[in-house]
């Protein structure tokens, strides 16, 4: 092994450990996988789902709980879809797998006008089929390959185009309460998954076989976030962290916080008494409005 190959191997090992750590932490933080779970891993043939399956198989060997993995691909009968690729790859792994055949492509083409993006309807049909199949095979969890950048992009898509503060949760119960969806890659940056897929030489299947243009709005958001992260490294990571530290009382949604019934309560002592000694650190660190008012009253400016 020459020096370059040795260096590449070291870099790959660091990347793999980082992704394993991200996935393991996400699973632990949201209790994604429990003892005896049968996890249906949705495999599209893209870099993210390949990476998710690879990492979950690796973690399965040393996990503190016993669980099963079942790989499932939905063949939507898109023209030119290479049907042999996924079975050939999965045959090399020690894993149960299923190829589900549903001609959702014809349905989408018959409903969506020519030139319009088919991604939305295609996604809904795919989701419905996978939910039903999960029940059929007794899966207790459905693992999807959305990563950290997908989650942040969805936040801004909803913010800019739908006027909603909404993203993708790492763990979700379906509306009919019959399925639990998990996103083990929730903490993983897309660039790490791209590098991992390249290093592992996964047989990637392109997502444009249907001829649909990539969702333009999502692409705009993706480019915006890439620009931000290039100019201000860590910006996307910080935005994701904000999704984990929400303060409902500092927003404006009456469904999350009862603004209507707010009342005064002066029974408790004030945070800062008028005659209490003050320091510059009091002025620098005070965030509560009540404290600020007391400080203004207490400090003799003139």
Swiss-Prot record:
Q: Which residues bind [4Fe-4S] cluster?
A: 119, 122, 210
* Record field: catalytic activity: cytidine(32) in tRNA + S-sulfanyl-L-cysteinyl-[cysteine desulfurase] + AH2 + ATP = 2-thiocytidine(32) in tRNA + L-cysteinyl-[cysteine desulfurase] + A + AMP + diphosphate + H(+)
Keywords, A to Z? 4Fe-4S, ATP-binding, Cytoplasm, Iron, Iron-sulfur, Magnesium, Metal-binding, Nucleotide-binding, RNA-binding, Transferase, tRNA processing, tRNA-binding
State any GO CC term: cytoplasm
Q: Offer an example of a GO molecular function term for this protein.
A: magnesium ion binding
Cofactor section: Mg(2+); [4Fe-4S] cluster
Q: Where does motif PP-loop motif map?
A: 44-49
Pathway-wise, it operates in: tRNA modification
Supply the EC number(s): 2.8.1.-
Q: Which Pfam families match?
A: ATP_bind_3
| Signal peptide from the UniProt entry | none
- Cofactor binding mode and count: Binds 1 [4Fe-4S] cluster per subunit. The cluster is chelated by three Cys residues, the fourth Fe has a free coordination site that may bind a sulfur atom transferred from the persulfide of IscS.
Give the function comment from the record.
Catalyzes the ATP-dependent 2-thiolation of cytidine in position 32 of tRNA, to form 2-thiocytidine (s(2)C32). The sulfur atoms are provided by the cysteine/cysteine desulfurase (IscS) system.
Self-association state and partner proteins as the record states: Homodimer.
Note, other: The thiolation reaction likely consists of two steps: a first activation step by ATP to form an adenylated intermediate of the target base of tRNA, and a second nucleophilic substitution step of the sulfur (S) atom supplied by the hydrosulfide attached to the Fe-S cluster.
Could you tell me which HAMAP family the record lists for this protein? TtcA (MF_01850)
Q: Which family does it belong to?
A: Belongs to the TtcA family.
Q: What is this protein called?
A: tRNA-cytidine(32) 2-sulfurtransferase
Originating organism? Teredinibacter turnerae (strain ATCC 39867 / T7901)
Source taxonomy: Bacteria, Pseudomonadati, Pseudomonadota, Gammaproteobacteria, Cellvibrionales
């Amino acid at each position: 092994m020459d020096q370059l190959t040795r260096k590449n191997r070291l870099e790959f090992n660091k990347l793999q450990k980082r992704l394993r750590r991200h996935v393991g932490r996400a699973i632990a933080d949201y209790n994604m996988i429990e003892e005896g779970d049968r996890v249906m891993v949705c495999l599209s043939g893209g870099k993210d789902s390949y990476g998710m399956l690879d990492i979950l198989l690796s973690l399965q060997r040393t996990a503190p709980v016993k669980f099963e993995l079942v790989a499932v691909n939905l063949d939507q009968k898109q023209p030119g879809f290479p049907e042999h690729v996924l079975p050939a790859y999965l045959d090399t792994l020690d894993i149960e797998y299923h190829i589900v055949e549903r001609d959702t492509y014809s349905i989408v083409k018959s409903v969506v006008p020519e030139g319009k993006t088919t991604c939305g309807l295609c996604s809904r049909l795919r989701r419905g089929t996978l939910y039903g199949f999960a029940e059929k095979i007794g899966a207790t969890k459905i693992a999807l390959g959305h990563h950290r950048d997908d989650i942040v992009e969805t936040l801004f898509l909803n913010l800019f185009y739908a006027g909603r503060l909404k993203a993708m949760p790492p763990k979700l119960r379906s509306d009919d309460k019959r399925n639990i969806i998990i996103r083990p890659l929730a903490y993983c940056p897309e660039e790490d998954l791209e590098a991992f897929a390249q290093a592992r030489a996964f047989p990637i299947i392109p997502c444009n076989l249907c001829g649909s243009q990539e969702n333009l709005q999502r692409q705009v958001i993706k480019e915006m976030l890439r620009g931000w992260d290039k100019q201000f490294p860590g910006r996307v990571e910080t935005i994701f962290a904000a999704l984990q530290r929400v303060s409902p009382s500092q927003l404006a949604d009456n469904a999350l916080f009862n603004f209507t019934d707010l009342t005064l309560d002066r029974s408790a002592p004030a945070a800062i008494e008028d005659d209490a000694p003050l320091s510059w650190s009091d002025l620098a660190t005070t965030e509560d409005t009540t404290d600020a008012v007391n400080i203004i009253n207490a400090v003799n400016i003139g």
